[in-house]
């Protein structure tokens, strides 16, 4: 299927750019307004704004591995983004759900990879907790990646349901 760019799913890349800009703007605000390691600003009884660094991946996975993981996660993010852009190029702009999902993942992945390559770590600042139990801090890029991935999973369930209903 060879489509021109204006009819392909590449038109959804504006959303990836928006996700990237929102992520970087929020991290810049945190870096400028909250000192690193500050205990946090309580927003609600279960949510703080904090300023922490993550040298690993989700849940600080591989954070204490000496630095190679920075490059590994950067290469992985670029590879995934390349694959998603390839898929966007092959699909129609009318395939909204997957276009949005892929673009959110691309924008989030590039937001975190930018931090890794420029800062050497990812800036996290969203801290949800219950009493003394804190969920690992995360950022908007992580949220965009999660939402995009959840949309892909939900789309898989919707597709399976349609197959079951079809005679």
Swiss-Prot record:
InterPro entries: Peptidase_A8
GO (cellular component) term, any one: plasma membrane
Subcellular localization: Cell inner membrane
GO biological process, one term: proteolysis
Entry's EC annotation: 3.4.23.36
Keyword presence, Protease: yes
Active site: 124, 142
Top-level class of the enzyme under EC nomenclature: hydrolase
Reaction equations catalysed: Release of signal peptides from bacterial membrane prolipoproteins. Hydrolyzes -Xaa-Yaa-Zaa-|-(S,diacylglyceryl)Cys-, in which Xaa is hydrophobic (preferably Leu), and Yaa (Ala or Ser) and Zaa (Gly or Ala) have small, neutral side chains
Sorted UniProt keywords: Aspartyl protease, Cell inner membrane, Cell membrane, Hydrolase, Membrane, Protease, Transmembrane, Transmembrane helix
Membrane topology: Multi-pass membrane protein
One of the record's GO molecular function terms: aspartic-type endopeptidase activity
One Pfam family recorded for the sequence: Peptidase_A8
Principal location class: membrane
Transmembrane segments: 12-32, 68-88, 99-119, 137-157
Record flagged with keyword Transmembrane helix: yes
Pathway: Protein modification; lipoprotein biosynthesis (signal peptide cleavage)
Record-stated family: Belongs to the peptidase A8 family.
Classification via NCBIfam families: lspA
HAMAP family: LspA
Protein task: This protein specifically catalyzes the removal of signal peptides from prolipoproteins.
Name this polypeptide is given: Lipoprotein signal peptidase
Protein species of origin: Aeromonas hydrophila subsp. hydrophila (strain ATCC 7966 / DSM 30187 / BCRC 13018 / CCUG 14551 / JCM 1027 / KCTC 2358 / NCIMB 9240 / NCTC 8049)
Gene name, Swiss-Prot/TrEMBL: lspA
């Amino acid at each position: 299927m060879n489509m021109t760019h204006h009819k392909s799913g590449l038109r959804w890349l504006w959303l990836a750019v928006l996700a990237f800009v929102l992520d970087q703007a929020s991290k810049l605000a945190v870096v400028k307004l909250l000192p690193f390691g500050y205990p946090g600003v309580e927003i609600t009884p279960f949510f703080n704004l904090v300023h922490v660094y993550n040298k690993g991946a989700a849940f600080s996975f591989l954070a204490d591995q000496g630095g190679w993981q920075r490059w590994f996660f950067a290469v992985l993010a670029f590879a995934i983004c390349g694959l998603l852009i390839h898929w966007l190029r092959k699909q129609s702009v009318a395939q909204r759900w997957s276009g949005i999902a892929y673009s959110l993942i691309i924008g989030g992945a590039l937001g975190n990879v930018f931090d890794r390559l420029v800062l050497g770590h990812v800036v996290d600042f969203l801290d949800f907790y219950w009493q003394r139990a804190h969920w690992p801090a995360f950022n908007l890029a992580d949220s965009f990646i999660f939402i995009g991935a959840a949309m892909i999973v939900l789309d898989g369930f919707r597709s399976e349901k349609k197959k079951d209903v079809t005679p």
